[in-house]
Swiss-Prot record:
Binds 2 heme b groups non-covalently. InterPro entries: Cyt_b/b6_C, Cyt_b/b6_C_sf, Cyt_b/b6_N, Cytb/b6-like_sf, Cytochrome_b, Cytochrome_b_C_euk/bac, Cytochrome_b_N_euk/bac, Di-haem_cyt_TM. Heme b b562 binds at H84, H183. One of its GO terms (biological process) is mitochondrial electron transport, ubiquinol to cytochrome c. The keyword Transcription does not apply. A ubiquinone binds at H202. Coiled coil: none annotated. This is Cytochrome b. It comes from Lumbricus terrestris (Common earthworm).
Length: 379
């Protein structure tokens, strides 16, 4: 009996089981589009980054000039740079939407997939941070100085660790060189972790909006969801194109158009918008070590939901109080993002502290409230 080559060829059948004949729930919504959109973002970032690296010079005397050269004299260099810079913003926007969907619909119950997703988030943050340093503008230099200096808060080994990261006694040429090397190699680690993420997801099967087992009623991924993903790609590329062609510097800090100067500190040092909520959490604790611990906890706490989940049903749609708290978490995240871009003064300090507390309260109290709801204590 004849079998299609996609089911028999050793290499093609791997692609087939991932993108063509994959059994998928028949009720997944647009919120399940962001995984494939993140794959698209990763490909865009790797390709544009590869071409940019051909013209970039990782040297403190020439880095800023080489970025200016890319923008002015390299054929379509301005386009590559804008796509790469704004593509990072789109990447993080989709990460937050993807993770938010996972929290809302209980996807963290697929613990291996969720934990690798959190590791992917950490790798992406490290990659983006080091990429932000490479243009060697004022905000690049001072951002690198401030963030790497946080490691000095670690007792006993802090000072040694910071100097080891810097490759000297300050952020200098050695720092820029190693950041460029890691910024180039980490996306390939992200690709490897992505393959593991997909592998574990397909081992257990995708979650769905109602959180029930959908094994009895699945449909092939192609053509149903491949068409749906193509629509997502079209909309995402259109949005990115509008940003790149009309407002390429919307998210760029004006300070970064000035070459790095260790003798002049910017009035307000801040990271890119997608790190502002973490920066607000860091600043909300009036102690260096405490702030670093809060920052670390804000990310590591994402490993907690698979361990603390006691819900009888997966989706928060069935838990009105938890659903209200979830949207409170989203509001807290948005307000912390705003606070991270504000000066360190009242009333921004107290607002940051309040919403930092609310951020952590969600993860601590959500399992208890869902358990009480299941036990019918709350009616």
């Amino acid at each position: 009996m004849f079998k299609p080559i996609r089911t028999t060829h050793p290499a093609i059948k791997i692609i087939n089981s991932t993108l063509i004949d994959l059994p998928a729930p028949n009720n997944i919504s647009i919120w399940w589009n962001y995984g494939s959109l993140l794959g698209l973002c990763l490909v865009i970032q790797v390709l544009t980054g590869l071409f940019l690296s051909m013209h970039y010079v990782p040297n403190i005397e020439m880095a800023f000039s080489s970025v200016a050269l890319i923008s002015r004299d390299v054929n379509y260099g301005w386009l590559l740079r804008s796509i790469h810079a704004n593509g990072a913003s789109m990447f993080f926007l989709f990460i937050y939407l993807h993770a938010g969907r996972g929290l809302y619909y209980g996807s963290y119950n697929l613990s291996e997939t969720w934990n690798i997703g959190v590791i992917l988030f950490l790798l992406t943050m490290a990659t983006a941070f080091m990429g932000y340093v490479l243009p060697w503008g004022q905000m690049s230099f001072w951002g690198a100085t401030v963030i790497t200096n946080l490691f000095s808060a670690i007792p006993y080994i802090g000072k040694t660790l910071v100097e080891w990261i810097w490759g000297g006694f300050a952020v200098d040429n050695a720092t820029l060189n190693r950041f460029f090397a890691f910024h180039f190699i980490l996306p390939f680690a992200i690709m490897g972790a992505t393959i593991l993420h997909i592998m574990f997801l397909h081992e257990s099967g995708s979650n769905n909006p109602i959180g029930l087992n959908a094994d009895s009623d699945r449909i092939p991924f192609h053509p149903y969801y491949s068409i749906k993903d193509t629509l997502g790609y079209t909309l995402a590329i259109s949005a990115l194109s509008l940003m790149v062609l009309f407002e390429p510097n919307l998210f760029t800090d004006p300070e970064n158009f000035l070459m790095a100067n260790p003798l002049v500190t910017p009035i307000h040092i801040k990271p890119e918008w997608y790190f502002l909520w973490m920066y607000a959490i860091l600043r909300s604790i009036p102690n260096k070590l405490g702030g670093v611990m809060a920052l670390f906890a804000a990310i590591v706490i994402l490993f907690i939901p698979p361990l603390t989940s006691v819900m009888n049903k997966r989706s928060l749609s069935f838990y009105p109080l938890n659903k209200t708290m979830f949207w409170g978490l989203v509001a807290s995240w948005a307000i912390l993002t705003w606070i991270g871009g504000r000066p360190v003064e009242d009333p921004f300090i107290i607002i940051g502290q309040v919403f930092t507390s609310l951020y952590f309260i969600y993860f601590i109290s959500s399992p208890t409230i869902s358990k009480l709801w299941d036990d019918s204590i709350i009616i």
